[in-house]
Amino acid sequence: MKAHICVATLAAGLTVTSCSDTGEIVGPTGVQSGARFFVSSATSVTGNLGGLQGADNRCQSLAASVGLGAKTWRAYLSVERDSDNGNRPTNARDRIGLGPWTNVNGVVVANTVADLHTRKGNADVFIDEQGRRIPGQWPGSPGPVEHDILTGSNADGTVIPGLTCDDWTSASATLAAQVGHSDGLGPGGNTANGLDSWNSAHANQNCANTAPRGGAGRIYCFAVN
């Protein structure tokens, strides 16, 4: 027999009990308590995220807003000079723990770091902390397209020099950032030439405005524990 785990919450004077067939406790928002990955719902007009610390703080705050704040969350971002790493490069793949990672609907994103960096983007898997798909090139998607997620990374999760918005501190129109496609789709659903990559599809236009080419300054957030 499949186990059902339930949690009672008080909302508008009523006790609401939520259950999960997967064995996870489900909060009033429907977020699985074991979730360890999401795309940020919060956006940024520029590539200045306040550095790695500012981006990590964003992930932590968003996680807390849906009851996942007990975990330690990190932004999937690469940098060329990390002050916490002797001003040496830090790769996004080395910031996020060892896995496995599931999204807030309980769907497995990847079991290991290696698995994560061989999979493709998917609108139904790469969702935000509230369980919503990111507007992109998937059929029926609302506009504007916002599937360009900031990473500064190659497909293997290592830093791309010159494509990190000066380590996520710059809003310069002369700098740019590497982005991935959360839905794994290019214009018209094209998946050729790396457009299906969740973390390294192409460079954005510049760090002064994340919107052109299909972005909104979103980031990927992973729980390390």
Enumerate the language-model features and the residues they cover.
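Bacterial N-terminal signal peptides that target proteins for export
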Residues: 1-8
